[in-house]
Amino acid sequence: MDTIRAIIFDLDGVICFTDNYHYQAWKELADAEGIYFDEKINGRLRGVSRMESLDIILERASRCYTQEEKEQLATRKNESYVRLLEKMSPRDLSDEVKNTLDTLRQRGYKLAIGSSSKNTKKILKQIGLDGYFDAVSDGTNITKSKPDPEVFIKAAEMVEEKPENCLVVEDALAGIDAAYAGGFISACLLYTSDAADD
């Protein structure tokens, strides 16, 4: 087995939980548009881009939306989401996660973020991890979302490691598929709904 030298973490659902903020922002948008949206539908949005998420929500719409309208809807959702992120603080970073990160760093691993979110840097700042990671690859520097491996490949390049020397830690199937497609070692965190709420 190849030596693991770097660990690439997804952000949402691994380092911290922002699912509820996403849900609130999507729900607000769907309600305003008269589109049915619930937590089950929200579950389908895990690990996919904002525009792909919007397409899933619009499957239940009573009318078709132009590309321009879709972009406006996605912007509205993100504005709501960013507003909700203001509520985040270092308290949203669990002691277990922070201790794990510190231990991995002390053991000499390079640490990176590989997230499709375009709000990654804001979230890291809100939870007190701004500047903590050796590299941050996110939705602002990729053109393809998971399950394409681009976000992880860029993170590996940023820490100057080959994919086979990087462990990807994910919580979504799209992320695990992306890690596999890129030739990375992967670990999937699974949570029950009760565990995610704790």
Give the positions of each predicted feature.
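Short, acidic loop-to-helix structural element flanking the phosphoryl-transfer center
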Residues: R83-I113
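Helix-loop "lid/cap" segments that line or gate small-molecule binding pockets
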Residues: L29, M51-Y65, I123, A155-A156
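Conserved small/polar residues in nucleotide/adenosyl-binding loops
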Residues: Y191-D198
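Anion (oxyanion) recognition and catalysis
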Residues: D31, R105, Y180
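Active-site neighborhood of HAD-like aspartate-dependent phosphohydrolases
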Residues: M1-G43
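Substrate-recognition "cap/lid" segment bordering the active-site pocket of phosphatases
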Residues: P90-R91, K118-L167, L173-F184
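Conserved SAM-binding loop
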Residues: I15, I113, V168
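Metal-dependent phosphoesterase signature
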Residues: Y36, E59-D95
